[in-house]
């Protein structure tokens, strides 16, 4: 159980002068008091005025508004993060709706593509394959000693943009910023990591400014041995850390998750986090439509690790609502670039083979039996839910959506691919094609849709609703693993926060301005599930709630006292 975070207790600091001003976790800038300026040899290094954090945030907000392009805003915010982290999070706290798309999706995708061009200052760890013999030393070199949450990527599948090499570091940095801004996890406890195993992206290899290892990606046994060296080193350095895998390629994501989820407290946000927020959204949407998830039929476009992860969680939820395994699987249809997954298709991946439809059940379908398209699935299976995780734009066509609407009065349509340029259909089109009847959730942010004098808020099915609460719940409860039951608890807690399901109006998911309260609610249910499943010490619900509240970091300056090294 984590100890209370006492914001009133002074920090004893050994640093002084310019060194203190260069330490982003400790720097207060113009907010250092007169006493602190004298004690820490800061006289003459700062303007005369002593400011509050609110005054600093107001100046930063005005400066932010001067930038016209999102990537410029991203670079500006990252610069604040790298100079004064408390101010950075205070600024986010006041403008989260505006700034979340800037620090994370969709703008972070552009930042990853141009990582080597916009690079300013080191953050996190760059662990390269040529330096694999020194991984233990690298972890010792981390600027933060008490690391409790690591987000790691190898940069191979960055959003819908593919292989970005070490440019993928933008994702762990952005993800951990949301762990703090949304989940209250102190930035002193977080560490972004990129595993530099080369890149197969010719644009990166041929870029004279590319800062990563200029080499084709290592693969197979060589790759897995390197990842294992990293995992074992992490276990030696921080044995109780929460490790999140992020944006690994489909061929590696599931094997790595399966290999390490019972060895270290870990999860894969692309597979499990995406599934958890999707399930929460679907439970809420089903309630809003007056049904249960067990009553729905689901069609997927995209049968990669993320899509199949969502599908498996849908099946688990349907089973919890009373369906048998066979009945639940018969209600889920997976379509990829080769068509509907059936038991006749060769060369399926292990996680895909569990989700095939039996050919004999499709015998009376009116379709091309060799490659059954999404449109043919919609005509024959008559899905009530359609989920896009294909990474390809525009594939939810007007014909497909209108065909779905013919047999479903309240279709649930979730084009989840991101960034925005990769979305399967735009919400305004889906609303128009269904005459305002569809319930829509997207993976990227979209403005509300105006249709026939009505305003339709568009829920962003954003993993940020889930993973900060999971992280907070793990830290507060002291859980040593993340179980399927904990993930399902997170989904149900999110559904319970749905304005549309609870009030019959509003958005499918809570407003981002409420995300800290949502994270606390999810953390409580995740912590309870961890205790029930034997991966955390059992305490009372009241004690768990107090641990969550006490561990929820706030961006406020603490007083400093001088000490020696």
Curated annotation (Swiss-Prot):
A GO-annotated cellular component: cytosol
Binding site for a divalent metal cation: 246-247, 270
Binding, NAD(+): 157, 270, 418
The protein's name in its UniProt record: NAD-dependent malic enzyme
Gene3D superfamilies: Malic enzyme, N-terminal domain (3.40.50.10380), NAD(P)-binding Rossmann-like Domain (3.40.50.720)
Cofactor dependence: Mg(2+); Mn(2+)
Entry annotation: catalytic residues: 104 (proton donor), 175 (proton acceptor)
């Amino acid at each position: 159980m984590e100890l209370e975070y006492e914001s009133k207790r002074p920090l004893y600091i050994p640093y002084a002068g310019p060194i203190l001003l260069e330490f982003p976790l400790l720097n207060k800038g113009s907010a250092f008091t007169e006493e602190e300026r004298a004690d820490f040899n800061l006289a003459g290094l700062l303007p005369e005025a002593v400011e509050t954090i609110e005054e600093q945030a107001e100046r930063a907000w005005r400066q932010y508004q001067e930038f016209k392009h999102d990537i410029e805003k991203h670079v500006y915010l990252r610069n604040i993060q790298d100079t004064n982290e408390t101010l950075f999070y205070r600024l986010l706290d006041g403008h989260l709706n505006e700034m979340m798309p800037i620090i994370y999706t969709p703008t972070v995708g552009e930042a990853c593509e141009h990582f080597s061009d916009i690079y300013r200052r080191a953050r996190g760890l760059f662990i390269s394959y040529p330096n694999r013999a020194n991984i233990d030393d690298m972890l010792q070199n981390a600027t933060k000693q008490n690391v409790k949450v690591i987000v790691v990527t190898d940069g191979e599948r960055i959003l819908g943009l593919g292989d970005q090499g070490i440019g993928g570091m933008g994702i762990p940095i952005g993800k951990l910023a949301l762990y703090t801004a949304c989940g209250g996890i102190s930035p002193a406890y977080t560490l972004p990591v990129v595993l530099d195993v080369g890149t197969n992206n010719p644009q990166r290899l041929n870029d004279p400014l590319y800062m990563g290892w200029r080499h084709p990606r290592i693969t197979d046994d060589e790759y897995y041995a390197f990842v294992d060296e990293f995992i074992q080193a992490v276990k030696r350095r921080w044995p109780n850390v929460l490790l999140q895998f992020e944006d690994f390629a489909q061929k590696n994501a599931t094997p790595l998750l399966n290999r390490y989820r019972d060895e270290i407290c870990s999860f894969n946000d692309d597979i499990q986090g995406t599934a958890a927020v999707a399930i929460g959204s679907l439970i809420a949407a089903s309630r809003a439509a007056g049904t249960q998830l067990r009553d729905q039929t689901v069609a997927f476009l995209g049968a990669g690790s993320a899509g199949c992860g969502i599908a498996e969680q849908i099946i688990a939820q349907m089973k919890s609502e009373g369906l048998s395994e066979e009945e639940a699987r018969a209600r889920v249809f997976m379509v990829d670039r080769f068509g509907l997954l059936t038991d006749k298709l060769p060369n399926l991946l292990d996680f895909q083979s569990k989700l095939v439809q039996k050919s004999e059940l499709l015998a009376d379908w009116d379709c091309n039996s060799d490659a059954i398209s999404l449109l043919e699935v919609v005509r024959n299976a008559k899905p009530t839910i359609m989920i896009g995780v294909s990474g390809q734009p525009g594939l939810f066509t007007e014909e497909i959506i209108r065909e779905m609407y013919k047999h479903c009065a309240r279709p649930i349509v979730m084009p989840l691919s991101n960034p925005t340029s990769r979305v399967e259909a735009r919400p305004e089109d889906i609303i128009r094609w269904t005459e305002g009847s569809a319930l829509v959730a997207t993976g990227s942010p979209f403005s509300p849709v105006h249709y026939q004098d009505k305003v339709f808020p568009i829920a962003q099915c954003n993993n940020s609703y889930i993973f900060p609460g999971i992280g907070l719940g793990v830290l507060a409860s002291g859980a040593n693993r993340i179980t399927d039951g904990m993930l399902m608890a997170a989904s149900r807690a999110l559904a319970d926060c749905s304005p549309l399901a609870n009030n019959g109006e509003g958005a499918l998911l809570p407003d981002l301005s409420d995300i800290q309260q949502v994270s606390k609610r999810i953390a409580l249910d995740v912590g309870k599930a961890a205790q029930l499943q034997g991966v955390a010490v059992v305490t009372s619900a009241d004690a768990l709630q107090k641990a969550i509240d006490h561990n929820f970091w706030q961006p406020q300056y603490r007083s400093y006292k001088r000490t020696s090294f």
